[in-house]
Structure formats: structure tokens, C-alpha cells
């Protein structure tokens, strides 16, 4: 088809020109032109309507072109891409790739072992599961280097991690100290236990004091050593029946000889350390900081009632020192938490009054959340005002006990670091899914824990880099947004392209934090 002009002569000798859309058709052995459409007078079309007509036709034409092209596009698969880009950068920046190469002496298995280890670590961070399924999980992630991995690579990588744990930790320690300027004037130590659902390594997993409250299961004990600003330095795995003091003595020697650090302080949460253990720690000349269970210890009430001025450490942390019974206590106060605790109690009391008025006494007595505020005198049940006044004394406060010479604010900050250690253990056992443990040989168990430890190091490295940017984003949200960045395998007219989806949410923060540019929207892949 084409456009032609058709000129008509008027009676007065003037002319008028029309535009026509014409097609050529063969009729017999001749070619004839057939008018498909009369578009109008040329002078009127040139006044502006011609441009509008052309624009409309181009839009219609482009849509048709795109529809035709779309029929030629084959989107074969979309795989998760964002997290592997971020954590691979951190993996290499922390020197793990180079350390693997050095330990394996450049052998042919170097890349497979290193990639298998990285895959398991990323799996712990994103989608924890048994190693028996990690071989399937890697197929959902875009990393071409993983296409050649087989199940035996993962198991052999676990063995490698167990065998070379000490050297990997030493290399990491040196690199992390340099990258993040860690405060290493003191380091903190805490332990946890984790029990077994699967078969256990005989003589390694054993019955012992269970912090998971599962004395019916064999377990192992895990300790993590962290800097005072919460960065993981090393970890140890002990048989399940190891005494806590023995783990502490072990780590003190480790710190002195392996890392050349002078001071280790045992930091423990409320209820996790017995009075007997504290006495043994002091007799051994070691230091501790432990939380006090305020409502279960008479000394805590005495300490809270002692006069003294609080010293401001931060907007949400005030501290004061109290010596009672020859023991040093640090009272910590958070004004924001005080308001929160007070509000929660007021709401509980309001509901309590409603239920008392409705005669729901039996329900209240059986509910521990309400029963603590009740005063029962024979058949008479009412609100215990004395208990309410006593509860107000605890609002926004917690008490620490220590035998260290640290300043009160340093004690409080060190205990806050414990939260990060405890968070690390929660990550190990839940988010990083240390339990249930299915690897039943001692070497595989140790390798599994090492995978979790490396995942924790990568997570803390990313958190630290984001903090250094001055950005405030929730880590879980960041991971979700990174997982939305997909690599899409496209085939167009026989050509191969790799396309990516758009960055969403706070994913771009992660790329800025680690200094990596997001991939191009579309990349033409080499022909194979």
C-alpha cells in the first residue's frame, strides 16, 4: 500500500488535491490500483489533521509490531538474582574466595568446593533447609557457576569447612578487623545448646543442661565469640554434656593464643548462669556480666530501691551503679520502655476490672497474666494495689551484675552486645535453621555449624555497611526486596538475552552499601 495524490479541477480553473491510500492488485495479466481509503483534502490535512493521523497510525503500527515481536519472545525461566550479587561481593571482600584458593592450593576441586560452600551459606541466609535439598534449591538462584554442582560437592565442602575451621576463622578475623575497624579491647562470649532431631554422632552429641528445655534429647553446645560491637569473631562446638565454665576457660586460652586478645568477659542473659557458676568464674580469676531476674531475686528489689543518680548514656539508656552485699550491680533505665511497660499494665488492669465486674473470676485465676495482679482472700477476689505499686518499680529497668572493672556505661553497652549474640543464636537455630540437625557425623555437624557461622558473618557485614551509609532499613525487608530482583532468560529470534526485573523497595540500598552496580536491564548473551 502507498499514499497517492488525486487532483480534481474546478469549473473556475482552480484545483483541489486529495490524499488516497491505495493498493496495487493484479487482475489477470494487468496491475490495477484500488483505493483503500480517501484520507481527505491535502490542504485541510496539512493544517494539522495529517500529523494527528500519522501519529495515530504510528501508534497502531507500533502496537502491532510489538505484538508480533512478543510472539517471537520466549521467557524460559526467572530465577532469584539480587541476594547472590550482594552476598557474593561480601564473600569475596571478606577474602573467603582467596582463602579457599590458598587452602586448596589451586587444585581442580577448588572452585567446586568454594562455590558449594558459598551456596550453602546463601541457602542459610535465604531459605534454610537440609543439605539433602540444597542441590534443588540452587536451581532457583541465578549463578551459572552452580550448574555443575552435585550433591557430593556439598557434603565434601562440609568436611572441608570442618577440617579448616581454625584457618578460615583466622583469615576472616584479620580481614574483618581491617575492613570494619573492630573494637577488640574486650570480646564477649556466650553459649547455647541445640538438640538433635536426626541421628546423632555418638560420643559427641550427649545429654546435658538444655537451654532449649529439651533434656530428653541429645545435644551439642555452641559458643560464639563476638567483639564488643557485636561482630562474630569465632565459634566453638562442644559435646552436649560440657560444663559451661569449661567452655569459658577454653575460649580464654583460644583468645590469648589464636587471636592475641587480652580480655574476655563472659556475658550471659538472665537465668542462664547459676550462682555456683559465678562463684567458679570468680575463683578462676575471670570476669562476667550477667542479667538479673528482677522479680525472682530479693537483692534486685533492694538494688532498685537504693537512692542514686542515673547517668545518661544515650536517649534511651540511663545507668547507675549500686553496691549491695559486696556485689556490684548496674541499674539500666530506658524512659521509652517505662512508658510502654506502664501502658501495657494499665491495659491489663482495665481488662481485669471488666472481667471482675462480669464475674469471670475462675477465668482470671487460671490466667497467669492476670493472676499476678489479684488479691484473693477466701471468696473475695480483688485487685492487689500493693503489687501494682511494686510492678511500677520495674518499669523500663533491668539490672546487671558484674565483677568487672568496666565503667557502668561500658557494662550496659557490653550487655546490649549480648542481645546481638543472642540474636545470633536465634539466627543460628531459627532463621539460619541450625535445628533440626540431620548431619549425624561429628565432622558434618561441625561443618554445618561453620556454614551457619559464615552466614552470620555475612549478615553482620551487610548490616554494618548499611549502618555506615546512615540508612535505616529493616534487614528482613531488605532481603525480601533483593529476592524480587530476578534474572529472566529470554530467547528472541534465535538470540539469547539475560534481562532483569526492576529494583523494588530498599534493594538499591544494598547495592550502594556493598559498592556494586545493579546489572544492565538487558544483556545479550554469547551464542553457545
What are the residue ranges of the model-derived segments?
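Accessory, often N-terminal, substrate/partner-engagement and coupling regions
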Residues: 51-112
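Anion-binding and metal-coordination hotspots
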Residues: 2-5, 11-13, 17-20, 28-32, ...
Amino acid at each position: 500500500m502507498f499514499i497517492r495524490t488525486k487532483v480534481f479541477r474546478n469549473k473556475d480553473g482552480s484545483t483541489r488535491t486529495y490524499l488516497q491510500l491505495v493498493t496495487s492488485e493484479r487482475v489477470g495479466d494487468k496491475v490495477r490500483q484500488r483505493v483503500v481509503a480517501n484520507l481527505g483534502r491535502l490542504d485541510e490535512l496539512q493544517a494539522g489533521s495529517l500529523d494527528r493521523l500519522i501519529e495515530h497510525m504510528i501508534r497502531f503500527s507500533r502496537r502491532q509490531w510489538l505484538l508480533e515481536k512478543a510472539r517471537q519472545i520466549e521467557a524460559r525461566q526467572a530465577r532469584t538474582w539480587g541476594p547472590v550479587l550482594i552476598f557474593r561481593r561480601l564473600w569475596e571482600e571478606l577474602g573467603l574466595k582467596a582463602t579457599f584458593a590458598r587452602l586448596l592450593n589451586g587444585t581442580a576441586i577448588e572452585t567446586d568446593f568454594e562455590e558449594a560452600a558459598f551456596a550453602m551459606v546463601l541457602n542459610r541466609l535465604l531459605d534454610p533447609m537440609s543439605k539433602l535439598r540444597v542441590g534443588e534449591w540452587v536451581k532457583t538462584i541465578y549463578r551459572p557457576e552452580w550448574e555443575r554442582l552435585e550433591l557430593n560437592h556439598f557434603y565434601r565442602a562440609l568436611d572441608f569447612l570442618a577440617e579448616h575451621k581454625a584457618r578460615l576463622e583466622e583469615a576472616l578475623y584479620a580481614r574483618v578487623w581491617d575492613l570494619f575497624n573492630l573494637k577488640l579491647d574486650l570480646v564477649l562470649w556466650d553459649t547455647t545448646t541445640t538438640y538433635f532431631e536426626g541421628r546423632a554422632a555418638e560420643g559427641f552429641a550427649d545429654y546435658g543442661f538444655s537451654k532449649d528445655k529439651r533434656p530428653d534429647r541429645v545435644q551439642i553446645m555452641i559458643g560464639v565469640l563476638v567483639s564488643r560491637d557485636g561482630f562474630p569473631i569465632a565459634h566453638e562446638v562442644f559435646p552436649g554434656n560440657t560444663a559451661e565454665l569449661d567452655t569459658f576457660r577454653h575460649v580464654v586460652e583460644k583468645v590469648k593464643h589464636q587471636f592475641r586478645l587480652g580480655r574476655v568477659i563472659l556475658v550471659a542473659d538472665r537465668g542462664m548462669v547459676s550462682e555456683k557458676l559465678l562463684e567458679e568464674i570468680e575463683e578462676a580469676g575471670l570476669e562476667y556480666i550477667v542479667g538479673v531476674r528482677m522479680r525472682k531475686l530479693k537483692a534486685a528489689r533492694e538494688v532498685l530501691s537504693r537512692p542514686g543518680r542515673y547517668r545518661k548514656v544515650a536517649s534511651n539508656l540511663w545507668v547507675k551503679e549500686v553496691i549491695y552485699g559486696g556485689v556490684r550491680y548496674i541499674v539500666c533505665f530506658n524512659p521509652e520502655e517505662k512508658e510502654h511497660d506502664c501502658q501495657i499494665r494499665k491495659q491489663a488492669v482495665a481488662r481485669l476490672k471488666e472481667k471482675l465486674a462480669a464475674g469471670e473470676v475462675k477465668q482470671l485465676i487460671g490466667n497467669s497474666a492476670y493472676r499476678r495482679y489479684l488479691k484473693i482472700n477466701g471468696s473475695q477476689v480483688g485487685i492487689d494495689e500493693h503489687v501494682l505499686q511494686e510492678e511500677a518499680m520495674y518499669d523500663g529497668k533491668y539490672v546487671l551484675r558484674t565483677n568487672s572493672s568496666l565503667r557502668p556505661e561500658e557494662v550496659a553497652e557490653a550487655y546490649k552486645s549480648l542481645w546481638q549474640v543472642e540474636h545470633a543464636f536465634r539466627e543460628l537455630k531459627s532463621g539460619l535453621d541450625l535445628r533440626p540437625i540431620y548431619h549425624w557425623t561429628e565432622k558434618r555437624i561441625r561443618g554445618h555449624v561453620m556454614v551457619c557461622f559464615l552466614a552470620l558473618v555475612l549478615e553482620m557485614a551487610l548490616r554494618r555497611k548499611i549502618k555506615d551509609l546512615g540508612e535505616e532499613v529493616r534487614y528482613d525487608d531488605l532481603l525480601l526486596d533483593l529476592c524480587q530482583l530476578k534474572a529472566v532468560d529470554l530467547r528472541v529470534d534465535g538470540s539469547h538475552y539475560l534481562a532483569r526485573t526492576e529494583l523494588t523497595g530498599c534493594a538499591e540500598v544494598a547495592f550502594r552499601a556493598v559498592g556494586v552496580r545493579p546489572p544492565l536491564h538487558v544483556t545479550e548473551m554469547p551464542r553457545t
